Amino acid sequence: MRLSVFWFLPTHGDGKYLGTNEGARPVDHAYLQQIAQAADRLGFGGVLIPTGRSCEDAWLVAASLIPVTQRLRFLVALRPGVISPTQAARQAATLDRLSNGRALFNLVTGGDAEELAGDGVFLDHGERYAESAEFTRVWRRVLEGETVDYKGKHVHVRGARLMFKPVQQPRPPLWFGGSSEVAQDLAAEQVDVYLTWGEPPAQVKEKIARVQAKAAARGRKVRFGIRLHVIVRETNDEAWQAADRLISHLDDQTIAKAQAALARTDSVGQQRMAALHGGKRDRLEISPNLWAGVGLVRGGAGTALVGDGPTVAARMQEYADLGIETFILSGYPHLEEAYRVGELLFPHLELNIPEVPKPAAVQAHGEHVAHDFAPQKVPQGER
């Protein structure tokens, strides 16, 4: 099976080391453009753009990088509760049209009550997923061309519709990650690609089996992806030395503060990530070549594959054998590590590299009448 490998745009900061400003670098548009263009040229299938108050806005970043890339796809966040599903569908269709079919969407419910409150979201874990399910039902149907009337507990729309269709039909793919029971139910019911963070293969196998069973019970199939960091070097020893250097400026106080901040989340996935290392740096290789050092201070994806090209490729194949089709990778700093992955890892993988999309046909229709409908064609005999 050919694998699709994505990279990551570090809109929340970048540098050579974790937990310190030593080796940090400014992340401006020029730098993000360098990373995006490197990923585009090296053969990455797309880039994940993170979301949250610590990040630049994912939609604006993606839109700004469309003109300077050719084949790269952009995976950006949908935020139920922060935006209406109808408006999100309009934005999704526009991004898909502007990118000529290179837009992908990642449903993010959030897990930090403090940050969510700042965005005006005061729902508990279960209610957020109920809202996300309602949001997604409307979002999908509107993007697929329906005029939607829907009244749920959290979402109420009447006559919701699009006037400009997306390029990808029936709509751009929807991605989603979540480890709780309600999250997996949502994935089984509505999403196209289920994402997991980089847990050991045995745990990933269990997750995939649960989501597959839930999807099958609904008459659906779901594809699977995984989010990992990667530290690849010419030799295994060099890779492990690089892993040690990444946290070499990290002190115990910073680790403790980071773990305390992450502990306030109600995200089951984040709790599972934290359990892999327990906030301690003495046993970070939690599975062969799977290192949990990143998660000492980073929320979300907290594990890295470490080794030379053949070793990392073999570990990726273990995940692929479980059903993983897409790998979303990253490394510090993201520009240099994109090239290392391209030069040291890609030769050992069978890659699914997207082609440059052909321009989509856009039908001329004139200005919409009264902001409500497209003007009619003039009959042939009346011209």
From Swiss-Prot:
Pfam families hit by this protein: Bac_luciferase
InterPro entries associated with the record: Alkanesulphonate_mOase_FMN-dep, Luciferase-like_dom, Luciferase-like_sf, SsuD_RutA_monooxygenase
GO molecular function ontology, one term from the record: alkanesulfonate monooxygenase activity
GO biological process: alkanesulfonate catabolic process
Keywords in alphabetical order: Flavoprotein, FMN, Monooxygenase, Oxidoreductase
Coiled-coil segments: none
EC number assigned by the record: 1.14.14.5
Recorded catalytic activity of this chain's protein: an alkanesulfonate + FMNH2 + O2 = an aldehyde + FMN + sulfite + H2O + 2 H(+)
Protein family (similarity comment): Belongs to the SsuD family.
Additional notes on this entry: FMNH(2) which is absolutely required for this enzymatic reaction, is provided by SsuE.
Job description of the protein: Catalyzes the desulfonation of aliphatic sulfonates.
Assembly, per entry: Homotetramer.
Protein name stated in the entry: Alkanesulfonate monooxygenase
Source organism (scientific name): Erwinia pyrifoliae (strain DSM 12163 / CIP 106111 / Ep16/96)
GN (gene name): ssuD
